[in-house]
UniProtKB/Swiss-Prot annotation:
Keywords, comma-separated and alphabetical: Plasmid
Pfam families: pXO2-34
Superkingdom of this protein's organism: Bacteria
Lineage: Bacteria, Bacillati, Bacillota, Bacilli, Bacillales
Protein name according to UniProt: Uncharacterized protein pXO2-34/BXB0033/GBAA_pXO2_0033
InterPro entries: Plasmid_pXO2-34
Organism of origin: Bacillus anthracis
Length: 100
């Protein structure tokens, strides 16, 4: 799966609101953790670790989630610190500044 990247010169991240477990299960496809694991979100409420080939309940891993991506590979939620809140984000196009 190809992950979509936005240029920092043309787009910016805008924080909208906090993401809970229900929203994560409905919108997310892939989750990255602070220790470098990439997990896939399953329909039954679990996360699947492809490297370890095991299922982990989302309630056990929710505090360790760093970023959440949808099926297109676009980041839809992000956390800056391990003790922070998981916040929903959207990419906004930056307005062009007029040169004087």
């Amino acid at each position: 799966m190809r992950e979509k990247e936005f240029s920092k010169s043309t787009h910016r991240l805008k924080v909208t609101k906090e993401m809970d477990i229900g929203t994560l299960l409905n919108r997310a496809h892939k989750v990255s953790t602070f220790d470098g694991k990439n997990l896939i979100v399953l329909d039954n409420g679990n996360l699947y670790d492809q490297a370890g080939r095991r299922e982990v309940p989302v309630t056990n891993m929710f505090r360790y989630i760093k970023s959440v991506r949808n099926s297109d590979g676009i980041v839809i939620a992000k956390k800056n610190k391990p003790c922070g809140k998981l916040m929903q984000v959207i990419f906004e196009r930056k307005a062009k500044q007029k040169v004087k």
